[in-house]
Amino acid sequence: LERIPTNVPNLDYILSGGIPRSSVMIISGAPGAGKTVLAHQIAYSNATPDERALIISTTSEPMSKFIRFAQEFAFFDMDKLGNAVIYEDIGARLLEGDGGRMIDLILDLVRRHEPSLLIVDSFKALSDLASSREQFRRNIYRLIGFLSAIDCTTLLVGEYEHDDLHRSPEFSIVDGILELNNRFVGLRNYRSLRVIKMRGSDYVPGEHAFKITYEGITVFPRFVTPPKPLRYTPSEEKVTTGIAGLDELFGGGVTKGTSTLVAGEPGAGKTVTALHFLLNGAKAGERGIYVSFQEDPNQLERIARNFGFDIDRIESEGLVRMFYTSPVELDIDEHILEVIDRIERLEAERVVVDSVGDLEAGAARDHDRYFNYIYSMVQHFKNNLITSMLTAEMSEMFGSGLIMTGRGVSHIADNVILLRYVEMDSRVKRALTVLKARGSYHSDEIREYVISEKEGLRVGDLIPTHRYALSNLVFADPGRMEV
């Protein structure tokens, strides 16, 4: 099946290579959704003097306004105007005639210019003129039959509502339907598109985010796990965390390519632990990326220096990169594409995500996707033998609710480290235990976790404790336990 590339970043991936040649496709959406931008971007990226694009406007607005609109974007090419990209306005005549006469007018323009790509914006204006659904259906059949015979790919742009998909006859006749949306969630607006229909062609289903910038539209495909597991050979190699005493709790380190969740209350040491994991990996020659949503690179670098790491040298040698994104403006699909791109460019073997809770803000338009996103992200790391560490905040200090189960993050991670506060001898100390190490040995001991700028991080002695040590206030003398 021959295709016409859209040349819109990542859209051709969703369309399995582009728009099928000689097909007729509707681009639908509410005003402001980005339909006209998308149509123009496709036109200017494909048009040549031999393969012309004809853009027919039905808006009865001056063509100069249409052209000024296109000039706002980087894809506009003045050299193509008039000989490769041709504009025609039938808006004024549209008010004088019926839908059938307008179809004839479009066909006359197509015969005159012989385009390879035809865009009618807005096509819905023609449907509004039709005296009956049956008459409009016949006119569409006539238009599509003619365009198919002359090998012309057609984009029909219209301000359709979602319910029109089931009411308007054109949707059942055309070969493809691409629906664009722009909706507000809280104080943010989210743009997305999805393929409703693509006759005789595969495509990536679901809702895909996109943004509009000076460059035009960029699409961020919905990040999912492949339907069939990728074939890869799991590693048996153990990699060091570099934290004194922690590797021993895992029987010599964590397994390469696995994911480790570090969960704990605020200040328990999650970020410091994750940073040590990454920087100690750099000491061993493993490149890594720190993906942060709370601590910016300046703060992380300060923490690293306080613990004696030569972070300037490590970064200058390309061993570690910090990638900070504000959770307020986060879109998870856009973000993971950037993370994967940075991983590939650095050839990273370790990744830290601090913290997974902040990713929920990026899933605001679809909270059900949060779990699916985390799962897909971890699987991607695993498929590429990237050892990852994720952090998650627990809200209850000294309280219960230790483990996130079911569809929680701990269900996805291979290893789980729990950091808690305990009270011993009138002091608040930190406790660490390994709750889980999938498919391998781990200690079940509860140990003191020492964080010191002089000593670094260290897993200390066993904590003498009652069996409720991790869920209640703990004292050195179990007889003094207060529940």
Write out the residue ranges for each language-model feature.
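P-loop NTPase motor core
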Residues: 25, 100-173, 177, 330-416, ...
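Short glycine-/polar-rich loops that comprise or flank the Walker A/P-loop
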Residues: 22, 49-52, 82-85, 150-152, ...
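Conserved nucleotide-binding/hydrolysis micro-motifs of P-loop NTPases
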Residues: 59-63, 91-96, 124-126, 154, ...
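Hydrophobic/aromatic beta-strand patches that form the interior of the parallel beta-sheet core
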Residues: 25, 54-56, 86-88, 155, ...
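Flexible loop/N-cap segments at domain edges
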Residues: 241, 247-267, 272, 280, ...
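Walker A/P-loop NTP-binding active-site region of P-loop NTPases
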Residues: 15-76, 249-311, 412
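Conserved inter-motif catalytic segment of the P-loop NTP-binding fold
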Residues: 49-130, 286-365, 369-372
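Conserved P-loop NTPase
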Residues: 1-2, 111-113, 182-240, 244, ...
